[in-house]
């Protein structure tokens, strides 16, 4: 089965877009195939507050036939650096939708961490030929209630809870 996010990730790579897959969908890549994965309805991509990078991300989405939204309205045109700068100033989320109920959020914030810090610790995964960068072991997105996921060796990831509420 092909991952629905793979075509977009290939288009992002072609444009040298910097992003990290975070949230529940990101945590699922650390789980061994024989284990059950967490259910989620979307993919969360964390991007740096860089207008040119955001513009390239939008172009990659359009190239793969995806629609761009700001809340419940189509993202305005022209989609240029000026619009990207406005989105960054407001830390606005771009919602991306596509076939088969594909939903991707292009987020410019991750509570408690800045992009450059997380980017330095990234760990790539290869899914359907697409490299998908993710936060490295020990970095967890506080946007979700998931436990932090830590790699103990190359082939043996484990889940480590950080609070008693989980």
Locate predicted features.
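Compositionally biased terminal segments of proteins
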Residues: 1-166
């Amino acid at each position: 089965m092909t991952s629905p996010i793979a075509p977009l990730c290939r288009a992002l790579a072609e444009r040298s877009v910097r992003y990290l897959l975070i949230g529940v969908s990101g945590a699922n890549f650390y789980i061994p195939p024989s284990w059950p994965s967490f259910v989620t309805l979307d993919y969360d991509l964390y991007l740096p507050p860089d207008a040119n990078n955001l513009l390239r991300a939008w172009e990659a989405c359009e190239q793969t036939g995806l629609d761009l939204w700001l809340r419940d309205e189509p993202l305005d045109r022209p989609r240029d650096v000026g619009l990207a700068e406005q989105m960054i100033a407001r830390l606005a989320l771009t919602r991306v939708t596509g076939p088969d109920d594909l939903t991707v959020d292009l987020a410019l914030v991750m509570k408690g961490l800045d992009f450059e810090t997380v980017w330095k610790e990234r760990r790539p995964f290869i899914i359907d030929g697409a490299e998908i960068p993710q936060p490295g072991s020990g970095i967890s997105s506080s946007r979700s209630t998931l436990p932090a996921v830590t790699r103990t060796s190359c082939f043996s990831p484990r889940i480590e809870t950080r609070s008693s509420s989980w």
